Amino acid sequence: MASIQYLNATHTLYSCLKHSTPSSHDYSTCFLQQDSLTCSIFVLLCTVAYCFVWSILCNNVSKVDQIWSIIPFVYSWVFFLHYYFLNNEIHYRLLLVTLLITLWGVRLTYNFARRGGYGNFIQHEEDYRWPILRKMMNLPTWLLFNLTFIAGYQNLLLWLIALPANIVSQGGAGWDELGFLDIVLGHIFFFLIVLETVADQQHYDFQEYKYSLTPAERLKSSQKSVREGFFQDKYWKYCRHPNYLAEQSVWLAVYLFSCISTGELWNWSVVGIVLLVLLFQGSMQFSESITLSKYPLYAQYQATVPKLIPRCCCCCDASSNKKEKSE
């Protein structure tokens, strides 16, 4: 039945687009004739094609990185606008979720842009991990990896993490549906955005300062992080990836909005946050292997500082006391 539904949806979309000059009415009719999930799938397929084709034309697979902070809130706005135009009313919980995801996207887009991630659109920086992986594969294997994982799976994941917003759209829409839990979760979401922003800024300031010094000046620096080459102060002395901790928690909060809407702790959209956590685990492991190859003292940092979850103060104190006694 699902396959028939999507075949019908594809036929309707083709009917809307086959005219040389379709009107805005044609587009809106096509949009509302499909359910919001189907509309989002069309966006997903377009982004996969865009990322794969442009990665070949530009010899740069970081097109997914460029839309990473943008496409999730596009999906959320698709869900919100579809509900609004179909029902002629505002879904307030969905609007709240959409605005929060948009806030996340604007912040992350700015952070990516200031690091030169967008360049001049055609020529832009490629994530340092991709060239390393590219050297490990022959061309056919790399192209297959590009299509299935970089352009395919990562875009699928961006779609999946936004799907709790679709679950929210199926729940109560009225202003009176917003309750205490929505307010608490909204504040937690905002706190996580601030946490991630501060952590990113700390690391950005460190990198800017480090690369403003000559290699000789770095070795003579009074700052341990500068001498050893990697940041290990402020938030980064509590865990090795505080920004990633906040990032994953942000999407857990998005999922919890769907739980509030359904009144149940579990729904099928949980697959997005689960797969996101798994992706981050692999990404962190690969990134740290590169860092370790450049900075041997990073192994000591790994041994003493947790990867994601900071140790509580009492655990840290107990560990320090134990270390002092052993010495």
Identify the residue ranges that each predicted region occupies.
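N-terminal, membrane-interfacial amphipathic/helix-forming hydrophobic leader that caps
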Residues: 45, 52-60, 66
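Juxtamembrane helix-capping/reentrant segments at transmembrane boundaries
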Residues: 60-74, 116, 120-148, 229-236
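Intramembrane alpha-helical segments
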Residues: 48-54, 142, 167
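Voltage-sensing domain
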Residues: 144-154, 159-160
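Hydrophobic transmembrane alpha-helices
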Residues: 2-48, 71-112, 155-202, 207, ...
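Broad structural signal for hydrophobic residues in well-ordered alpha-helices, predominantly aliphatic
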Residues: 53-54, 133, 291, 301
